[in-house]
Every structure is written in structure tokens, then in C-alpha cells.
Design a protein with these regions (language model features):
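Sequence-level detector for tyrosine residue identity
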Residues: 13, 22, 45-46, 60, ...
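Serine endopeptidase catalytic core focused on the charge-relay Asp
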Residues: 91
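Coupling/hinge elements of helicase-like and P-loop NTPase modules
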Residues: 95-106
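GIY-YIG nuclease catalytic motif and its immediate N-terminal context
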Residues: 1-36, 71, 79-82, 86
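Conserved short loop/helix modules at catalytic or binding sites
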Residues: 27-81
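Small/flexible residues
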Residues: 7-10, 51, 75, 105-106
């Protein structure tokens, strides 16, 4: 019997704002893609509110009244963490989103 897969699906997503966009990657940890994306958006929102990061995304999220105002969209699903992060870097290089301030590997 073959060994079960140990890698998981990852979602490459985009947060769209009036001041630009942000491209990121997250593991599909919930039962649906939408639930996983909402959980990731909530985590971004929480960190922006509780930490003092000066990242462009955090600064934008601090202007929102509620996490439900975050417009998060799926770009694609990728199997495996390494492949997902490599694809995220490709998309960041291609689109140069304004809110991605960490350009390592881009």
C-alpha cells in the first residue's frame, strides 16, 4: 500500500484594497477555501491591531473598522509548502503588489 501524502494544499491569495494589493500564501486548514481565507484575513487583522509593525498591509488594515471589510480572493491552490511559496514569489515578482513590503526572494 502506498504511503499517504504528507503535504497539504496551500492557497495563494490576494488582499485587494483601494491603495494596492497584497499577495500571500496560507495552508488550507479549514473545511473550505473560503473559511481558510477568512481565518487568514482575521489573523492579518489581529496582528495589525496588536503589533506595531510598520508594514504597508498592517497600516492599511488599521484603518478598517472590522475584519469583515477585508477583500480577500483566491489566486490558486498549490499542493505542498515549498511549491506554494515558490509560486507566491513568482506572483509577487510578476505583479509587484504595493502592500508586499517584504521583497525577499522576489
Amino acid at each position: 500500500m502506498p504511503k499517504p501524502r504528507s503535504d497539504r494544499n496551500h492557497i495563494i491569495y490576494e488582499i485587494v484594497t483601494p491603495v494596492g494589493s497584497y499577495i500571500g500564501v496560507t495552508a488550507k486548514t479549514q473545511t473550505t477555501v473560503l473559511k481558510s481565507l477568512r481565518a487568514r484575513a482575521a489573523k492579518h487583522y489581529y496582528r495589525a491591531r496588536t503589533e506595531t509593525k510598520t508594514w504597508a498591509l498592517c497600516q492599511y488594515l488599521r484603518t478598517l473598522e472590522d475584519k469583515s471589510e477585508i477583500d480577500i480572493r483566491m489566486h490558486e491552490m498549490v499542493r505542498g509548502k515549498a511549491d506554494a511559496h515558490a509560486r507566491e514569489r513568482e506572483l509577487i515578482r510578476r505583479y509587484n503588489p504595493a502592500l508586499n513590503t517584504d521583497k525577499r526572494g522576489a
